Structure formats: structure tokens, C-alpha cells
């Protein structure tokens, strides 16, 4: 049976890890064993934070919508409830963008939701 030399695959694997560790400080950028640990930890952080980013942005959108709705005399929960009553299906990302960049359009939506809320309260 022929002898298998694994220098090529080892070098390729090491190069891949060292390439991922580019920009790290100290021996973390050029010592394979240390770089491997740092890269594995970095990939764990990246995996975790891809999920955390979704939570963070949703909460940011909610804060922006809440602040803009309160400027027009409406609580966030009432505003969202009024949107569902008025059959407005804009998501929070779009609403937050409107609250920051298109305040006139956001004001019109707030007026529509206020109207829908008063109609539902009168009906009860």
C-alpha cells in the first residue's frame, strides 16, 4: 500500500484558518493553534449575533414607532391595534422608516388609526 502524505491538505486547512484570522492581534493571526481557537470563537459570536441582530432591530423599530406615535398623542399598543382595525398591513420596519423620514405620511396613518379606534369604541 502506498504511503499517503498529507502535507498538501494540512497546508490548505492551515491557510484557510490563517486567512480567516487576518486582522487579529498578536499570535492569533499567524500561529495556527491559537488562530483556530480565535476563529472558532469568532464564528460562534457571528452565529449568535446574526440572531440577536433581528431582535435588536425589531426593538429599535418599536422604540421609533412608539416615540413618533406619542408625539401625535397615541400609545404604541393603541397605534398597532388601530392599524389592525383599519386593515393597514405595514410592517414595523416600514412604519419606523416613515416615522423618521416621512412624518407627514406617518401623521396621516396615525389619523386613520385614531379614526378606526374611535369607531371601534363607539361600536362597543
UniProtKB/Swiss-Prot annotation:
Pfam families per UniProt: Ribosomal_L20
GO BP term (any one): ribosomal large subunit assembly
Gene3D superfamilies: 6.10.160.10, Ribosomal protein L20
Molecular function terms from GO: rRNA binding; structural constituent of ribosome
Keyword set, alphabetical order: Ribonucleoprotein, Ribosomal protein, RNA-binding, rRNA-binding
Domain of life where this protein originates: Bacteria
CDD domains linked to this entry: Ribosomal_L20
Summary of the function given for this chain in its UniProt record: Binds directly to 23S ribosomal RNA and is necessary for the in vitro assembly process of the 50S ribosomal subunit. It is not involved in the protein synthesizing functions of that subunit.
HAMAP family: Ribosomal_bL20 (MF_00382)
Record family assignment: Belongs to the bacterial ribosomal protein bL20 family.
The protein, known as: Large ribosomal subunit protein bL20
Organism of origin: Ehrlichia canis (strain Jake)
Amino acid at each position: 500500500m502506498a504511503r499517503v502524505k498529507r502535507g498538501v491538505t494540512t497546508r490548505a486547512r492551515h491557510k484557510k484558518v490563517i486567512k480567516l484570522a487576518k486582522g487579529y492581534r498578536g499570535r492569533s493571526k499567524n500561529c495556527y493553534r491559537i488562530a483556530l481557537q480565535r476563529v472558532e470563537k469568532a464564528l460562534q459570536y457571528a452565529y449568535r449575533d446574526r440572531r440577536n441582530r433581528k431582535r435588536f432591530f425589531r426593538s429599535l423599530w418599536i422604540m421609533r414607532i412608539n416615540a413618533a406615535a406619542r408625539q401625535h398623542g397615541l400609545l404604541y399598543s393603541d397605534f398597532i391595534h388601530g392599524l389592525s382595525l383599519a386593515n393597514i398591513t405595514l410592517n414595523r420596519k416600514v412604519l419606523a422608516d416613515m416615522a423618521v423620514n416621512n412624518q407627514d405620511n406617518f401623521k396621516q396613518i396615525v389619523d386613520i388609526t385614531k379614526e378606526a379606534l374611535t369607531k371601534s369604541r363607539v361600536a362597543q
